[in-house]
């Protein structure tokens, strides 16, 4: 990172924190975008990163998003001036987010914690030769649409920003 000085950098929060620590006061004026994903960052860690960037010549703010292989891409982001600290950003175009009760499957109102579910044009059709996991992950709701159940907990605030609370389960499928 010190040698190449990238303008746009995306990494896991753990790696971003390691880089900030390793920079030892060096300029970050080259940094236009600093984005993370794959795990959460505490508000204190996010503040540490943003303070370092500001003190060392960058106008960038740490941004995050949410995505899974099952979507083939990111489905929420804080880019393009829709940044809000400690959120996953807002859903991308043609992406719908729904928070559902983990017991009943019913949609929850703004501010209530439940399972993050998404419907997007880029979502997968199925897991290869794994109909059981497909049925658990992709579910048709009362609205007739097929939704990806992420296994993650979160909520949506009144402004449409998605918040991450934690994981219901951890899956490593290879």
Tell where the protein language model's regions lie, with residue ranges.
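Catalytic cores of nucleotide-enabled group-transfer and carboxylate-activating enzymes in metabolic
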Residues: 18, 22-24, 83, 93, ...
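Alpha-helix capping/helix-boundary segments
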Residues: 14-16, 41, 123
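Gly/Ser/Thr-rich phosphate-binding loop
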Residues: 6-11, 20-87, 96
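Conserved ATP-binding/catalytic segment of the ANL
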Residues: 109-111, 117-174
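Generic short beta-strand
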Residues: 97-98, 153
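Short coil-to-beta-strand transition motifs
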Residues: 89-94, 148
């Amino acid at each position: 990172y010190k040698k190449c000085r990238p303008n746009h950098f995306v990494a896991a929060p753990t790696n971003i924190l390691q880089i900030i620590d390793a920079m030892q006061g060096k300029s970050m004026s080259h940094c236009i975008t600093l984005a993370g994903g794959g795990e959460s960052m505490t508000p204190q860690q996010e503040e540490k990163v943003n303070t370092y960037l500001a003190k060392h010549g960058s106008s960038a703010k740490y941004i995050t998003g949410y995505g899974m292989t099952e979507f083939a891409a990111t489905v929420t982001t804080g880019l393009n001036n829709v940044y809000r600290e400690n959120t996953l950003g807002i859903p991308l175009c043609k992406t719908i987010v729904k928070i559902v009760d983990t017991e009943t499957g019913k949609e929850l109102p703004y501010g209530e914690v439940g399972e993050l579910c998404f419907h997007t044009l880029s979502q997968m059709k199925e897991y290869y030769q794994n109909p059981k996991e497909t049925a658990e992950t992709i579910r048709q709701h009362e609205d007739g649409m097929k939704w990806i159940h992420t296994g993650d907990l979160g909520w949506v605030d009144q402004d449409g920003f998605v918040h991450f609370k934690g994981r219901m389960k951890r899956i490593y499928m290879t």
